């Protein structure tokens, strides 16, 4: 959550982080203060060569009934927009000035399948696991989705999911996540 600066409805988790303790690439432990933690839409320095082990969040006190009501509203809103099947959430980041889900839907991605993974019928930017999805299936499906959008709209979608290559490095380009040409859809 901290590494990707998760957020919803105009809020991001980095807005409330006071500090985070991380294990760095070399194995050293370091505490980063708020002013050292840069981030933006779906990224933060906490996710670059680091693993977050603990953090302090500065949450605001509010009336418990009001908090419960807001939480319930958010759950209902998400329940209406996101599929009930198991998923990893949004596949792609929104491109500037548009929505990945809109482009994917217009490109005809809903219902696409590969390796047991399937693009949700409810939200085109979500790959669901109806029961037998494989990592390779998710990777190939994401690449196929990105190809469709690029070919139809000239927009290169950027992964929000973290896909690792064989060396454990994050692959940002979904088309490059494939060792071979994407399947024909």
Question: Language-model segments: what does each one mean?
Answer:
Residues 1-18, 87:
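A gly/ser-rich beta-alpha-beta helix-loop segment of oxidoreductase catalytic cores
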Residues 23-140, 144-185:
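Phosphate/pyrophosphate- and phosphate-bearing ligand-binding catalytic cores of soluble enzymes
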